[in-house]
Amino acid sequence: MKIIHKGLVEYLPTFEAMKTFNANRTASTEDELWVVEHPPVFTQGLAGKPEHLLIRDDIPIVQIDRGGQITYHGPGQLVVYTMIDFKRRKTSVRNIVSALENSIIATLAEYGIEAAADPKRPGVYVGERKIASLGLRIKGGSVYHGLALNVNMDLSPFTHINPCGYAGMEMTQIADFVQPCPTPDEVAAKLTAHLETQFTPKADNNE
């Protein structure tokens, strides 16, 4: 699995690059993780409803092809795009989602933050507050899009929407629990290590 750090990049060209990567991949294309941050942007998934945008401001909205509703990306949020051929790995999308959730939970545990997944709602939560979002697109036996983990960002734009379609959803971030707060790059080093562990094929034996 190749890990590519792209830094702070605009959302739309990154979205187009994901689609191109997935369309052009072959049976031998190596899976990739793209580690990025984005300037402020709302992204509206395939199930998105206009009423979940509560306040219209100057933050752009991009209609995209992942599952789910509307969410927000901005500087200080760690985004990891997961370009994974799950068919080749002989796994399921549900297992991919669990691997993403478990990697986030393990990363947060390294900072003393107790987080959990919720079987009724996508994402990772600290108590009732959401700290990470997940959204995937399944196409041709592969997935793309991925996860967004709030590290140290301006959370106020989340109040302009119903995050992921949930009215009143309260958001949180690593900076609410850890000071001095690690940088997104520092968190990325831990998170990608956990992702690599989750996606390393396990030996098939009876030992």
UniProtKB/Swiss-Prot annotation:
The miscellaneous remark of the record is: In the reaction, the free carboxyl group of octanoic acid is attached via an amide linkage to the epsilon-amino group of a specific lysine residue of lipoyl domains of lipoate-dependent enzymes.
* Residues marked Lowers pKa of active site Cys (site): 130
Annotated active site residues, numbered on this chain, are 164
Location of the protein in the cell: Cytoplasm
Tell me where in this chain the BPL/LPL catalytic domain is found: 27-203
Source species, please? Neisseria meningitidis serogroup C / serotype 2a (strain ATCC 700532 / DSM 15464 / FAM18)
Q: Name the keywords, alphabetized.
A: Acyltransferase, Cytoplasm, Transferase
Q: What class of enzyme is it?
A: transferase
This enzyme catalyses: octanoyl-[ACP] + L-lysyl-[protein] = N(6)-octanoyl-L-lysyl-[protein] + holo-[ACP] + H(+)
Q: Which parts of the sequence bind substrate?
A: 66-73, 133-135, 146-148
One short Pfam family name for this protein?
LplA-B_cat
| Organism classification | Bacteria, Pseudomonadati, Pseudomonadota, Betaproteobacteria, Neisseriales
Q: Name one GO molecular function term.
A: lipoyl(octanoyl) transferase activity
What's the protein here called? Octanoyltransferase
Which purpose does this protein serve, as stated in its record? Catalyzes the transfer of endogenously produced octanoic acid from octanoyl-acyl-carrier-protein onto the lipoyl domains of lipoate-dependent enzymes. Lipoyl-ACP can also act as a substrate although octanoyl-ACP is likely to be the physiological substrate.
Per the record, the domain of life is Bacteria
Tell me which family the UniProt entry assigns to this protein.
Belongs to the LipB family.
Task: List the pathway annotation.
Answer: Protein modification; protein lipoylation via endogenous pathway; protein N(6)-(lipoyl)lysine from octanoyl-[acyl-carrier-protein]: step 1/2
